[in-house]
């Protein structure tokens, strides 16, 4: 929360409009809570355009189901005016049912199970990498299933650069 509060102070001091990608906000690992950008202050609520979508979390890519939350009337009008130009943002019947199902009690129960499985898998990957590749470190994510692996110490101990490691991964898999 404090990171968002500090960032919003900088944005307020510079009169910035904030676009907040909250699309991963449903995919939170056990023991953590998502903090929406707009919730940290009244100013954050007024200057932030927040985008959400069930597509990544519920594997609904390809369906039109993203949405935004904009409290500021001026910003909302600007976003809607631009969004309406493409004609692509009109929700269809399939998308409406998918969105409703995703956020139903059954969908939330499925999501809880998914997050528990992802958490176990992420811990397995961390333990595997650290046991087989001394010097490789990573932090478990609080949300999403994306990993950022630090191979710097492992590369130094093997006399290669991170670019060499990346190249080997591309060329040899």
Feature map (PLM): residue ranges:
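PLP-dependent class I/II
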Residues: 1-173
